[in-house]
């Protein structure tokens, strides 16, 4: 049976977990979640119906370790798991480079860095996937499958990851501004606020689908 260990099950870690479970990529009995405390680990495990990891030792036998923690927490997590020689590590921590990840892990560990964006939480994200030096084609395909469950993805160089991350990461904020402006205009001409927001959002959503198709 597959074993997956997720460090950090907040907004993005939770989106990855929920999306992969919903798409049937993972089974609940395969998943272990590790938070900053045993209590938090148990709470998140209970919320998603998965296992709680108390000390991260599951990294030793895990098929995949996902780092979904804040960048300042990453060094401690890498130190914690490196002694277990994890086979594959996927990090979504912003600004933590492949060089830093690979340098802190055993030489044989396959590493991939991913930059998702917030719409992943509703299954419409855009993720940039940058494979490390040792990442196998099979691991790259696995990363593509995971983030396809959350929207769209693209395999890029690490430099392109930062560039695409800036575009898709900041992009939703600009879209929100446009939606608000359109909704305000709708209210000014007499529409109820709720209807104006819905119409504005659907208009942008439809336009985006036309571009993609």
Language model: regions and residue ranges:
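NAD(P)+-binding Rossmann beta1-loop-alpha1 motif at the extreme N-terminus of oxidoreductases
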Residues: 1-54, 124, 187-189
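A structural micro-motif
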Residues: 2, 29, 50, 87-88, ...
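Hydrophobic packing within well-folded, soluble alpha/beta domains
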Residues: 4-6, 65, 90, 143
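Short, well-ordered alpha-helices that flank and scaffold nucleotide-derived cofactor binding pockets
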Residues: 14, 18-22, 46, 79, ...
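Small-residue helix-packing motif on alpha-helices
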Residues: 31, 41, 74, 192-199
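Rossmann-like NAD(P)(H) cofactor-binding subdomain of soluble oxidoreductases
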Residues: 38, 47-48, 56-129
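Internal alpha-helical scaffold of NAD(P)-dependent oxidoreductase catalytic cores
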Residues: 100-110, 126-164, 176-213
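Aromatic-residue-lined binding/catalytic grooves and analogous aromatic/hydrophobic interfacial grooves
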Residues: 171
């Amino acid at each position: 049976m597959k074993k997956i260990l997720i460090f950090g099950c907040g907004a993005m870690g939770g989106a990855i977990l929920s999306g992969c479970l919903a798409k049937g990529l993972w089974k609940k009995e395969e998943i272990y979640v590790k938070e900053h405390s045993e209590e938090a680990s148990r709470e998140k495990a209970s919320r998603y119906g998965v296992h709680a990891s108390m000390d991260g030792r599951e990294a030793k036998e895990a098929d995949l370790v996902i780092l979904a923690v804040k960048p300042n927490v990453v060094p401690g997590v890498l130190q914690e798991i490196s002694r277990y020689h994890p086979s594959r590590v996927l990090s979504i921590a912003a600004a933590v480079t492949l060089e830093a990840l690979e340098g802190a892990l055993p030489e044989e560990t396959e590493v991939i860095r991913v930059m998702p964006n917030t719409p992943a939480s509703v299954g419409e994200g855009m993720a940039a996937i940058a494979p490390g030096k040792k990442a196998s084609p099979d691991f790259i395909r696995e990363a593509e499958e995971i983030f396809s469950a959350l929207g769209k993805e693209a395999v890029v160089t690490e430099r392109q990851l930062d560039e695409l991350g800036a575009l898709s990461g900041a992009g939703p904020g600009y879209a929100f501004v446009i939606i608000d402006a359109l909704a305000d205009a709708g209210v000014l001409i007499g529409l109820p606020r709720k209807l104006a927001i819905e119409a504005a959002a659907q208009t942008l959503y439809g336009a985006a689908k036309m571009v993609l198709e």
